[in-house]
């Protein structure tokens, strides 16, 4: 076991105990100092981010992934503002969600408490570093971060700034830490740090999620993989459908709630596909379609079986013509990742059937999948989008970073 992990694990465990009973004011003060420090030291962050970008460009990283990695003054301000916004959110810690009285006079309550020490393993998104730190701090959790090697310089600087701010706020050392060793061996050891981690949350592509699920002995909450579909029903509004798929695919193609597949009912395909594909190509999207799609719009690439299950995270879209709603639902439930799925239709019964039968964390009617986000749902910031069913599902905000403690009041009862 890597010695860095043991040292940081012990520090995090100690910090989590103190954080568990820190007052809301103390935690909010720490968050405000973090936000202020990120803005004050923006130039330091950008200098380190420049190093990461130069290395990524040398490696031939895609433009979409470079966009996730890149920071500028506005993005740093946005990160700082997101931290400050967490101050405005209600503190769930200590909340008694229910209280009931037993026939023997015992009063039993359910209270929200921190999870303890949260491990987060993620890829090339420096904003996750600050977001995760803020959410964990607000909920009284210590956090150990393991970012991708692509963003190591940016992440180290952000955590340095956060640590300095927490020290100034008199919050415990070890509340927010990051692993400097980004090797796979250390990552695997991190996934097995049961003595110190209470939960592990991976954020990234399918490869990362699979590696964590296969190797972790620490309890895992899966997040992020989004093979999201837009289904155009035979009773869809054509213009609405085009607007939705263009937005869902191109607004930020490298995020998990971007659309990766377009399914089109055969009754509307000849009218819809030429318009939609033209609009998508104007945005630089490569189309990989089924044979029926190619028969309607010839100037595309043929999709393979592998395409239907793939999360591209790029300007690529798989397109398939389906017989009807039932085939669309069957296809989504077979190839989807239980993230976000959408139907475009004017038919109420078709929309209700889609909502009921599609198995996903977020299911939409006549809207882009890009709204699957804690902020857009009104929850505030999020730690990720859970695609599993146990502990949390969908956008994970503050409440999802808590667990229950039963508190029992008696007056001498014995059994």
UniProtKB/Swiss-Prot annotation:
Gene transcribed to yield this protein: proA
Pathway the protein takes part in: Amino-acid biosynthesis; L-proline biosynthesis; L-glutamate 5-semialdehyde from L-glutamate: step 2/2
Catalysis: reaction(s): L-glutamate 5-semialdehyde + phosphate + NADP(+) = L-glutamyl 5-phosphate + NADPH + H(+)
Organism of origin: Clostridium perfringens (strain ATCC 13124 / DSM 756 / JCM 1290 / NCIMB 6125 / NCTC 8237 / Type A)
Family membership noted in the UniProt record: Belongs to the gamma-glutamyl phosphate reductase family.
Annotated InterPro entries: Ald_DH/histidinol_DH, Ald_DH_C, Ald_DH_N, Aldehyde_DH_dom, G-glutamylP_reductase_CS, Glu-5-SA_DH, GPR_dom
Keywords annotated in UniProt: Amino-acid biosynthesis, Cytoplasm, NADP, Oxidoreductase, Proline biosynthesis
Superkingdom of source: Bacteria
Entry annotated with the keyword Oxidoreductase: yes
Reported function: Catalyzes the NADPH-dependent reduction of L-glutamate 5-phosphate into L-glutamate 5-semialdehyde and phosphate. The product spontaneously undergoes cyclization to form 1-pyrroline-5-carboxylate.
Pfam family for this entry, one: Aldedh
GO cellular component: cytoplasm
Enzyme Commission number(s) of this protein: 1.2.1.41
Biological process (GO), any one: L-proline biosynthetic process
Major subcellular location class: cytoplasm
Class of enzymatic activity (EC top level): oxidoreductase
Location in or out of the cell: Cytoplasm
Gene Ontology molecular function: glutamate-5-semialdehyde dehydrogenase activity; NADP binding
Protein name: Gamma-glutamyl phosphate reductase
